[in-house]
Amino acid sequence: MGDRFDRLGVRHANVEALLRRPGIGHNNGPTFDMSWGAWVWRRAAARAWKTPSPEVVRMRGKRAERLGITYKELTSALMNTGSNLGAAVMPLSLAARVRRGPKGEIIVEPRNSIAALVGRFGGRLFLLGDIDTVPALTEAERAEFLAVVNRAFDGRVEAIGWGHDAAALRGMLKANAVPHQETFMVGAGMGHRLLGDSAGLPLVKNVDSWFS
């Protein structure tokens, strides 16, 4: 005699998933990839994450110290991009106040705390200037602006880019043959963090923790 009740009709929707034999992958995931490409990738990843020698650790520690970042930040960027950090981009508005003097000349006044940090920086430094924050620069003044800035920062600034978005930042780095993977941003606030992230920079360092 057949069953008078349709047990299949009253089954919970998740019963089939619960009864299904689990896969052999981690956490009931897909099966382990045994392909040649996967093996090569796992081997390369294992070598990249291998514990470095004491000499390498010291070299990386000194580099991080020169750049004003932590050892962890340096190595994280290295593992994510395969490149060593060596350059920094800072918004001009964060580094200095720009105004016109009584005779119309451009005056750059470094912010005291930033000037001291720039003096300690041991990498390549670039500034990104928002055209709207600089008082109506002419083309001639813009061409001479780097020299004016470097008089205020003791020649530490390598180049200045103009704009306020990721395209302007990447364009400045490309014009100076600097890979963006080797560059981090020193900024303050969410706006600078979003700018660095959208430009693909591996690290955005808050100025409050720079060299601290």
Model-derived segments and their meaning:
Residues 1-37, 41:
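Eukaryotic charged/polar low-complexity linker/IDR segments
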Residues 34-91:
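Amphipathic alpha-helical packing elements
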Residues 89-126:
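Long, compositionally biased
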Residues 117-122, 149-154, 172-181:
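Flexible, charged surface loops at secondary-structure boundaries
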Residues 128-134, 160-164, 186-190:
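Structural motif
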Residues 139-143, 209:
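Extended low-complexity, polyampholyte segments enriched in Ser/Thr/Pro and acidic residues
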Residues 148-156, 185, 204:
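Preference for solvent-exposed, low-hydrophobicity sequence contexts
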Residues 169-212:
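Extended, charged low-complexity segments
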